[in-house]
Amino acid sequence: MPAPAEVQAATLQRFLAAWQKWDAQEWLDGFADDFTQITLPLSLGIPSRSRAEVEQVLPALVATVKSYQLTIRTVVHDPERNKAAVYALSTGTLPWGPWELEYSVFITFSEAGDQVAVLEEMMDSAFLQEFGPKFGQYLQANGGPRAVAAGVGAGGATAVH
């Protein structure tokens, strides 16, 4: 039996607000302990991430993308299936160029409906294929995800070209 629609709706609003604020901790606070992130399309070969893995990468991503702006185009909430879908566009600035990403997220709520249990993200694969390696190089050049998230690194932000 799905969680009450109003509980799911409140969780969805908290998720969207954290995303809009580009606040990693607020986002993480809404994830279930057994949370899983799945990057789509699966043909990209990106393995799913546990909550612990997302806790390492998300703060670094948020710290790396500056002047982040999110435009939410469509939200569909299906309380009977304990799910929601969001289509969004985002822009920002990376140390090596612009961040312009179009994506859809598919949310599965926890059994109680008060947390996000699964987040499937369908991202612009052309952007992601370029961004992924550069982000990895940037993290490595600047002391890893924790150092980037904390704003410290090898003498400040090192751009990747």
UniProtKB/Swiss-Prot annotation:
The keyword Oxidoreductase appears for this protein: yes
Keywords: Monooxygenase, Oxidoreductase
Pathway: Secondary metabolite biosynthesis
InterPro entries: Fungal_Meroterpenoid_Isomerase, NTF2-like_dom_sf
EC annotation from Swiss-Prot or TrEMBL: 1.-.-.-
GO MF: monooxygenase activity
EC class of the enzyme, as a word: oxidoreductase
PANTHER family assigned: AUSTINOID BIOSYNTHESIS CLUSTERS PROTEIN F-RELATED, AUSTINOL SYNTHESIS PROTEIN F-RELATED
Record's function text: Monooxygenase; part of the gene cluster that mediates the biosynthesis of agnestins, dihydroxy-xanthone metabolites. The pathway begins with the assembly and cyclization of atrochrysone thioester by the non-reducing polyketide synthase Agnpks1. The atrochrysone carboxyl ACP thioesterase AgnL7 then breaks the thioester bond and releases the atrochrysone carboxylic acid as the first enzyme-free intermediate.
Homology family: Belongs to the avfA family.
Protein name per UniProt: Monooxygenase AgnL5
Organism encoding this protein: Paecilomyces divaricatus (Penicillium divaricatum)
Highest classification ranks of the organism: Eukaryota, Fungi, Dikarya, Ascomycota, Pezizomycotina
Gene that this sequence comes from: AgnL5
